[in-house]
Amino acid sequence: MLPHVLRVLTLLCCLSGFALAQDWAKPRLEKSPRHLEWVTVRHGNRDVRCWVAYPEVKDKATAVVVIHEIFGLTDWVRGVADQLAEAGYIAIAPDLLSGTGPNGGGTESLGGPDGARSKIGSLPPDQVTADLKAASDYVQKLPACNGKVAVGGFCWGGTQTFRFVSNHPGVKAGFVFYGSGSENEPELAKIQSPVYGFYGGNDARINATIPKSESLMKKAGKVYEPVIYEGAGHGFMRAGEDPAGSPENKKAREAGWQRLKQILKGL
């Protein structure tokens, strides 16, 4: 029962912060000077469409797997990958809804956020983890990658981040943006990387799960460092990028980005 409740909780929280129109996200992406491309990553009988952004750097770079929100691989999520590339990292954002749409399509074929939501709740957890591992393995083997891979996710993707680091010990760090943590103690005991949390102060439903995550991670001897950005709401990394976003969300987004980049720099 509890895992089902957590899934519903994640759904409700993600819905609360979504702006139906994200027209502001695409123009920035289209103006990017960096190399951006679509690739198809195959594992088993699955073809996963992934968005890859490359930095303009001299040396090999650390890679980041970006896990999308409940709305699928949107322009904003692709923009996050580009902004990570701007900061000097290779970013890969898999469309975990690949194959769920008409004619085997993914997010783009589902007709918007409602269509994505209707599919994402029924994705098998093991399939999601396998898709993420395939994306991680792909980017880690790129000639431009230095072999280091971190993972970060937003909302639903934040929850998936916790699960992924539990099942993929090679990850250097996990970044959970306003996602609930696992309460599966044996699963948490498998985590070998530090987990960093980013939460909005005005997000009581998700923040109510933080103490339990802290307790279980401490009991397991794992590193979990949550930070709450006061005044910000759920989804502040996206809402703070919206030109019409509140000052609190904008401030939290900027602080979140700075923290993320500082941690990545130290990996």
Regions found by a protein language model. Name each.
Residues 218, 223-267:
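C-terminal catalytic histidine-bearing segment of alpha/beta-hydrolase fold enzymes
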Residues 153-157, 161:
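Gly/Ala-rich beta-loop-alpha elbow adjacent to hydrolase catalytic centers
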Residues 143-154:
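Alpha/beta-hydrolase fold nucleophile elbow
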Residues 191, 197-199:
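Short beta-strand/loop motif that positions the catalytic acidic residue
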Residues 29, 38-141, 238-242:
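Serine-hydrolase catalytic machinery in alpha/beta-hydrolase-like enzymes
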Residues 170-180:
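A conserved short beta-strand
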Residues 202-207:
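Acidic catalytic loop of the alpha/beta-hydrolase fold
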Residues 5, 11-41, 48-51, 156:
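An N-terminal hydrophobic leader/cap segment in hydrolases
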